[in-house]
């Protein structure tokens, strides 16, 4: 209790500052939502641009009664994709910078507090790693709330951690299922492109034949976009989980730490496999016009690399607060 009063006096924390903390956290979450939306929009625009380019090449050699009108629509779609893609990319960067700013502001307010000295060195990592930006902001907000209100409910925290872990595993299994859809066909690039699907023929009511390369490209691009989404969702969920695991050193949370640690290792391996396979698929395309369709594959490989970086940091954090527990024991 004396420690809480000391921290309260050193910071001169007023009750009104709770609203400021909440507003900063809400802003951080909103920026994260915009970050996720811009990332998904950029991926889908890249897929749309690639597909319509390929579709226009197909129309040039096809026999369609409305070829001129359809080609005009395709060109409009390509133009819209070319205009919106840099806009969403700039918004994505601005959201990322906003998250860094909020993270820095919260840590700047707490720089004189002894309770937060150990977390300051992770601020630099948060500039490069998306996972830690959200984690640090949530951690700081929780510690400030505990300073203002000593009546924290440990059982509520435990229940929240349980639900976050369940959500983490659910999203992870969705990612595994999407990966299974990609690697179910043969391992050659040609087999991946000719998936014998008539999805586009049904959706566009177009004369595309079943098994046409555009079907395979669009379907694979759609799966890759959803895999990018699951990666981002995993980063957000793991941020909340890390906040709980770093904040508490209770023995009852050891099982959650082990589960999260081994799952992180598994996703690390999956991310490495995804990176290698996406790059191989991307650069194994032989046709000249296929180079227009490499953006989704390359973007997914970058997301896989980001995943590996964040999970390596997760492992370092895991080792860090387990070393503290061993020293205390």
UniProtKB/Swiss-Prot annotation:
The keyword Membrane applies. It is found in: Cell membrane. The chain crosses the membrane at residues 29-49, 78-98, 120-140, 164-184, 217-237, 260-280, 299-319. It is a multi-pass membrane protein. Keywords: Cell membrane, Membrane, Transmembrane, Transmembrane helix. The keyword Transmembrane helix applies. One of its GO terms (cellular component) is plasma membrane. Its main location: membrane. Coiled coil: none annotated. To M.pneumoniae MPN_129. This is Uncharacterized protein MPN_090. The lineage of its organism: Bacteria, Bacillati, Mycoplasmatota, Mycoplasmoidales, Mycoplasmoidaceae.
């Amino acid at each position: 209790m004396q420690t809480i009063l000391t921290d309260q006096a050193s910071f001169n924390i007023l009750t009104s500052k709770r609203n400021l903390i909440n507003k900063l956290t809400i802003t951080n979450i909103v920026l994260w939502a915009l970050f996720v939306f811009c990332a998904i929009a950029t991926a889908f625009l890249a897929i749309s641009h690639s597909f319509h380019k390929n579709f226009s090449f197909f129309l040039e050699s096809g026999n369609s009664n409305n070829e001129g009108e359809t080609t005009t629509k395709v060109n409009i779609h390509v133009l819209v994709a070319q205009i919106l893609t840099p806009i969403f990319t700039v918004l994505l960067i601005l959201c990322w910078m906003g998250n860094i700013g909020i993270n820095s502001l919260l840590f700047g307010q707490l720089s004189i507090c002894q309770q937060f000295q150990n977390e300051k060195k992770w601020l630099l990592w948060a500039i490069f790693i998306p996972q830690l930006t959200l984690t640090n902001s949530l951690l700081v907000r929780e510690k400030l709330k505990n300073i203002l209100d000593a009546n924290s409910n440990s059982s509520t925290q435990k229940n929240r951690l349980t639900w976050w872990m369940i959500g983490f595993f659910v999203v992870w299994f969705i990612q595994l299922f999407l990966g299974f859809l990609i690697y179910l066909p043969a391992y050659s690039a040609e087999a991946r492109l000719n998936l014998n699907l008539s999805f586009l023929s049904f959706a566009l009511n177009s004369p595309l034949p079943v098994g046409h390369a555009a079907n395979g490209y669009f379907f694979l691009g759609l799966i890759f976009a959803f895999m990018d989404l699951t990666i981002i969702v995993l980063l957000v969920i793991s941020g909340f989980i890390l906040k709980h695991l770093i904040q508490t050193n209770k023995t009852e949370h050891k099982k959650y730490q082990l589960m999260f640690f081994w799952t992180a290792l598994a996703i690390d391996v999956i991310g490495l496999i995804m990176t290698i396979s996406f790059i191989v698929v991307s650069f194994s395309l032989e046709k000249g016009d296929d180079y227009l369709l490499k953006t989704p594959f390359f973007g997914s490989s970058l997301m896989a690399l980001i995943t590996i970086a964040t999970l390596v940091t997760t492992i370092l954090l895991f080792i860090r607060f387990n070393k503290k527990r061993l020293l205390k024991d």
